[in-house]
Regions:
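Phosphoinositide-dependent membrane-docking surfaces
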Residues: 54-58, 242, 251-267
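Acidic, Ser/Thr- and proline-rich intrinsically disordered linker/docking segments
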Residues: 261-323
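Alpha-helical transmembrane signal-anchor/signal-peptide segments
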Residues: 31-50, 201-211
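Selective detector of the "anchor" transmembrane alpha-helix that sits immediately C-terminal
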Residues: 170-199
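Anionic N-terminal interaction surfaces
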Residues: 193-239
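Hydrophobic secretory-pathway targeting helix
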Residues: 1-42
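Membrane-proximal low-complexity regions enriched in glycine and acidic/polar residues
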Residues: 39-125
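Extended, hydrophilic extramembrane loops/domains of integral membrane proteins
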Residues: 109-166
C-alpha cells in the first residue's frame, strides 16, 4: 500500500551527512594533533611520527640532493657537550629552511634555537622495499658519512638512524587538512541535497493533490488505478502524471514533456561492471534542459520500461520516447 512519505530519503540523507561530519571532525582532530605534537626528535622512537626539533646550527648550503626537487641539510639539534647532529630533507628554496639559515648566519640560533616541526623517518637500506606511507631516502647513512671526516665532531655525533623530513610532514598535514575539508563539504552537500529531496517530494504531493482530489488522504488509489505500476523500479503512470518514488517522490505532467527516455551509464568498480539507470526528460518550455527521475536500479530495467514507453507513446503522441 502506497503512503505519503514526505521524509523519505530526507532522514537517511541527514544520517549519512552526520556520519561524514563526525568523520571530518576526527580527521581534523588528527590534523590538530599533527600540528601540535610535543615529542622531540631526540626522544622519538617510531619512524613516521611528527616530531619537534630544536635547531642550534645548520649548514649554509645543502649537502646533497634527493631526487630532482629535494635537498639535504645537516643541523645541530643538541648543544650539550659536543652536540648532536642530524639530517633534514626539504624542498629546494624552502622558506622555513631559508629563515633558519638566516638566523644561523646572524649567530642567533645558539641562544635562541629554532623550533622546527617535521616527520621523523628511518632511511631505507639499499635494495630494501618501502612498506610505509612515507617516501624515505635510500642509502642515507652511507651517503652522510661519505661527506664527513670520520674523526670530526659532527661525524662522531651524527644521528643516521633517523632524519627529519619537512616534505613528508607538509604532505601529511595537507592531506589531513584537505581530507577534513572535503568530508565536511560532502556532509554539507548531503544536508542541502536532503532538504532539496524533501522540498521536491512535498511539491510532488501537492501537485498530485491539486490535479487529483481523489488522492488526498488515500494514495493507495495510485497503485489500484495506475495504468502502469512497477514496484521493482518504483515507477507509476497515473492519468497524466509519471511518478517515481525511489529516494523521494518526483512527478511530471506528461502533457508538458517533449522527450522521455532511459539513460544508461555503464560503470566498472573493482573489476565488476554494472549499469545505472535514470529516467530523463525534457520539457516543451525548456527543450535544452535535461531533467532526471530517480528509479531503482534493476538489471532488466530496459525490458520493464518497454510497456511504460508504449503507453506514453499511445496516450501522449507528442512525447518522443526511447532508451
Amino acid at each position: 500500500m502506497l503512503k505519503e512519505k514526505r521524509n523519505k530519503g530526507f532522514v537517511s540523507g541527514l544520517v549519512f551527512a552526520l556520519f561524514f561530519l563526525v568523520f571530518a571532525g576526527l580527521v581534523f582532530s588528527l590534523w590538530m594533533r599533527h600540528q601540535n605534537h610535543a615529542t622531540s626528535f631526540a626522544k622519538a622512537e617510531k619512524s613516521g611520527d611528527p616530531v619537534t626539533m630544536l635547531i642550534y646550527d645548520i649548514t649554509p648550503e645543502p649537502v646533497g640532493t634527493v631526487g630532482k626537487r629535494h635537498v639535504l641539510y645537516i643541523v645541530q639539534y643538541d648543544n650539550q657537550n659536543d652536540g648532536k647532529y642530524a639530517g633534514i630533507e626539504a624542498k629546494k628554496d624552502d622558506a622555513t629552511i631559508k629563515a633558519i639559515v638566516d638566523k644561523a648566519q646572524k649567530g642567533e640560533l645558539q641562544s635562541d634555537p629554532y623550533q622546527l616541526k617535521g616527520t621523523q623517518l628511518a632511511p631505507l637500506a639499499k635494495d630494501s622495499k618501502n612498506t610505509s606511507r612515507n617516501g624515505r631516502i635510500v642509502g642515507y647513512s652511507e651517503y652522510i658519512h661519505s661527506l664527513l671526516d670520520p674523526t670530526s665532531i659532527v661525524s662522531l655525533n651524527m644521528t643516521t638512524s633517523y632524519y627529519l623530513s619537512l616534505t613528508e610532514y607538509n604532505k601529511d598535514s595537507l592531506f589531513l587538512l584537505l581530507g577534513s575539508v572535503a568530508l565536511a563539504g560532502l556532509a554539507i552537500t548531503m544536508v542541502v541535497a536532503s532538504f532539496s529531496v524533501r522540498k521536491r517530494t512535498i511539491a510532488s504531493y501537492q501537485e498530485l493533490h491539486q490535479n487529483y482530489p481523489e488522492l488526498q488522504g488515500d494514495l493507495s488509489r495510485l497503485a489500484d488505478e495506475a495504468s502502469y505500476y512497477n514496484q521493482d523500479l518504483k515507477v507509476i503512470l497515473y492519468k497524466n502524471h509519471l511518478i517515481t518514488y525511489f529516494r523521494g517522490t518526483q512527478t511530471i505532467d506528461l502533457r508538458d514533456v517533449q522527450q522521455l527516455y532511459l539513460h544508461v551509464t555503464r560503470v566498472r568498480q573493482s573489476g565488476i561492471a554494472r549499469s545505472i539507470f535514470q529516467l530523463c526528460y525534457t520539457r516543451k518550455d525548456k527543450p535544452k534542459k535535461k531533467y532526471r527521475l530517480a528509479i531503482k536500479n534493476k538489471k532488466n530495467a530496459e525490458e520493464q520500461l518497454y510497456t511504460l514507453f508504449a503507453q506514453v507513446s499511445e496516450r501522449f503522441p507528442d512525447v518522443k520516447v526511447g532508451i
